[in-house]
């Protein structure tokens, strides 16, 4: 769907290039700054400023489509083009039972949600920890959870970029589970990571290490600025999208410097805030519009697009339904290729809802069927 005109998309693109040229992005990892060539960028302390021509030329090596390999080849995913994949809820610290009881997430809750993720065919990949298992010590949590994801599901999975060693651990566990060589996994994307910039205009050390570790091993990196209009981004949607686009481009460029042709995707996560409390708002008309516009920007650069199915409602009520529908339909009309938090997200990401995961999976099935029929009619 064309939400913004071609002139409007081009205006956002040019504004983003001006931000990168005049203001630049803070790259806090010294090893990351060392990878930039002398020509095309200007580095002052941690701030990297980009020449527009350098940006547009460097991103040309990013692939428009690729396969994300799962442990079970039948669950491998084609990412990009007209392909669409839905993921589970990810990262909430709390869990809501079927009877409405709310408590901190445990490993048992984590495993229960993994079983449902494996069971529902409409959920195509494990988007992360369906709920944070806070009873696992943080020093070993990535090992235990990755073991669970690799043994209780056979779908593609996510790795949190929490430092170089943890990234390497997850990649090695995934390689062992797939029973492939280092050379093979380096040429077959098998795990993905989400890279969130610290808006405005900063990429911190764990995120940059994630890009370096994953891109050099040929794994999928999804650059997703978290830009809230009226908070860490301009209050206008055009301004917020320009900031989102500038930060996304900087990450995409860096991934291609690490390894030209490495799989990378453009993530859109721009919304507004409650101007009285400052709390993030999701599923709003503003979120829906930026989700659609983000897809247009991703297609302009020829890379896959990631969006999310989110809401801010505290209970499974009409508010939750409306916000989720707006988020989902904005993403779909934006041509999303990779939908995070497809089912189960509630309360602005503060809790994973078992009832909502069940109901939203049904809604995803309905949306998928409608889209498939529409594509069939267009091809006729």
Feature locations, PLM:
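Single conserved hydrophobic/aromatic residue that forms the stacking wall/gate
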Residues: 2, 364-380
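Catalytic-core signal marking the mid-to-C-terminal active-site face
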Residues: 3-15, 23, 28-35, 45, ...
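Catalytic alpha/beta active-site cores
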Residues: 49-234, 238
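Acidic, His- and aromatic-enriched active-site or binding-groove loops in soluble protein domains
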Residues: 147-156, 242-250, 290, 329
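Phosphate/pyrophosphate-binding betaalpha-module
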Residues: 210, 248-304
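Glycine-rich phosphate/pyrophosphate-binding loops
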Residues: 225, 256-268, 304-309, 334-347
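C-terminal catalytic subdomain
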Residues: 305, 315-363
């Amino acid at each position: 769907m064309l939400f913004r005109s071609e002139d409007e998309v081009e205006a956002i693109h040019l504004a983003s290039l001006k931000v990168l040229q005049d203001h630049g992005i803070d790259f806090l990892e010294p090893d990351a700054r060392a990878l930039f060539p002398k020509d095309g960028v200007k580095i002052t302390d941690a701030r990297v400023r980009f020449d527009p021509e350098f940006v547009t030329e460097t991103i040309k090596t990013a692939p428009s489509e690729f396969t994300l390999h799962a442990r079970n080849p039948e669950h491998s995913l084609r990412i990009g083009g007209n392909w669409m994949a839905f993921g589970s809820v990810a990262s909430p610290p709390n869990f809501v039972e079927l009877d409405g009881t709310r408590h901190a997430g445990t490993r048992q809750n984590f495993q229960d949600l993994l079983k449902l993720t494996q069971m529902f065919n409409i959920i195509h990949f494990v988007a992360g920890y369906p709920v944070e298992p806070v009873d696992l010590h943080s020093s070993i949590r990535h090992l235990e959870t990755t073991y669970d994801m690799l043994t209780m599901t056979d779908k593609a999975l996510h790795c949190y970029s929490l430092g170089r060693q943890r990234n390497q651990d997850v990649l090695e566990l995934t390689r062992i589970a797939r029973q492939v060589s280092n050379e093979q996994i380096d040429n077959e994307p098998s795990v993905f990571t989400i890279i969130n910039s610290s808006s405005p205009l900063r990429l911190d050390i764990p995120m940059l290490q994630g890009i370096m570790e994953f891109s050099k091993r040929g794994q999928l990196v999804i650059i997703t600025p978290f830009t809230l209009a009226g908070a860490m981004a301009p209050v206008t949607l055009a301004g917020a999208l320009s900031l989102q686009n500038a930060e996304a481009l900087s990450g995409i460029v860096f991934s291609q410097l690490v390894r030209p042709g490495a799989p990378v995707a453009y993530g859109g996560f721009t919304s507004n805030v409650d101007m009285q409390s400052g709390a993030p708002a999701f599923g709003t008309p503003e979120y829906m519009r930026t989700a659609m516009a983000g897809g247009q920007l991703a297609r302009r650069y020829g890379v896959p697009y990631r969006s999310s199915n989110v809401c801010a409602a505290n209970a499974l009520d009409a508010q939750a339904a409306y916000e989720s529908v707006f988020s989902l339909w904005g993403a779909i009309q934006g041509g999303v290729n990779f939908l995070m938090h497809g089912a189960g997200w509630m309360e602005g990401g503060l809790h994973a809802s078992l009832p909502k995961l069940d109901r939203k999976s049904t809604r995803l099935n309905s949306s998928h069927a409608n889209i498939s029929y529409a594509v069939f009619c267009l091809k006729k």
